[in-house]
Amino acid sequence: MITLEKVCFAYEHEVALRYIDLHIEKGESVIIQGPNGCGKSTLIKLLNGIIFPSEGYYFYKDHEITEKALKDRQFAKWFHQQMGYVFQNADTQLFCGSVEEEVAFGPIQMGLPKAEVRERTEDCLRLFGIEKLRERPPYHLSGGEKRKVSLACILSLNPEVLILDEPLAGLDGKTQDMLLTFLKDFHRAGKTLITITHNRQLAEELGTRFAVMNEEHELKMV
């Protein structure tokens, strides 16, 4: 489903990824760990099509993912519907005037009928228990509430792959338990998870395969 072949990436003269080989099958839950600065966040930005390999190849469902490929609007629309990326800092992906508008934004951009937009929006608000926040501006919410909204936004697109960067960081215990339960359910539904985390409980309960990045910006499966 997802294949990286000898992928390298550098910011100007600073290497961030060094000859990464990775293959992820549909329905796997891959945990990525490693020290700060080893390239983990760069790797998931590349998987989400935000940046592209300096060397090597990235394939998703046998399609090579390149900057040129994602300039095709139809292909880019398909790819970004497949890939759900939840940033560690939810503020970077919340920009609408209300929670309801935020959750509905993706389905509207997909061109879905109004009835389906409403249904997806209501389902996702209800799933994360944020129905009562629907009229609130996202910037007025707590960190945990923002994380729930950002996940609701991604789930409204019904992605095949969910990519998360430290999803439990900074959350209270109750919210952590709720999100962990959701992620387990998402995975049990046959979807694919790729998660960066230092949280041992999350890794042990969610991971089916484990990858470690080192200070040389290399990745090894363990």
Which residues does each predicted region cover?
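The feature captures the beta-strand-to-loop junction immediately N-terminal to the Walker
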Residues: 33-35
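Helix-to-loop junction immediately C-terminal to a conserved catalytic motif
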Residues: 48
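Conserved ABC transporter NBD signature motif
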Residues: 56-68, 79
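Conserved ABC ATPase "signature" region
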Residues: 115-133
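Conserved ABC ATPase signature
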Residues: 137-141, 145
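Catalytic Walker B motif of ABC-type/P-loop ATPase nucleotide-binding domains
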Residues: 162-165
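H-loop/switch region of ABC-family ATPase nucleotide-binding domains
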Residues: 197-198
